[in-house]
Regions:
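Non-transmembrane, aqueous-exposed alpha-helical and coiled segments at domain scale
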Residues: 1-121
Length: 121
């Protein structure tokens, strides 16, 4: 199975663009059993270290990801994933409100109940 690593600067950009106030983590079972999980925390542009996406196309083509190894988990539950979740929340400033722990609808942890705003389709 091919897996793309989490890109924190891109995630922050998308969250700001879409006014996201919390995350739902899904498919965490795909990475179960890894000691560490590679996470992009910034980009290198020549000698410069960037914490956010560059805006020029030329710079986008020239950047290299800066990858950190974050703690992995041996099972998908809120206790085992807590170090990863805390690090994600710290890096983005956005809380994780839902953790999907399996394929079934009842396999979910809700950390912060939320209200649906506006119309629901």
């Amino acid at each position: 199975r091919r897996v793309g690593w989490l890109d924190i600067p891109l995630l922050c950009y998308c969250a700001a663009l879409n006014d996201i106030d919390s995350f739902a983590l899904t498919k965490a079972d795909v990475l179960t059993g890894r000691d560490t999980v590679p996470v992009v925390t910034g980009y290198r542009l020549g000698e410069e270290l960037l914490e956010s996406l560059p805006f020029s196309v030329a710079d986008m083509e020239a950047i290299e990801p800066v990858v950190e190894q974050w703690p992995g988990w041996d099972q998908v539950d809120e206790t085992a994933m807590q170090p990863f979740i805390e690090r994600l929340e710290s890096a983005t400033g956005i809380p994780v409100s839902i953790l999907s722990t399996g394929k079934r609808r009842d396999e979910v942890c809700i950390f912060a109940p939320f209200q649906v705003e506006g119309e629901v389709a």
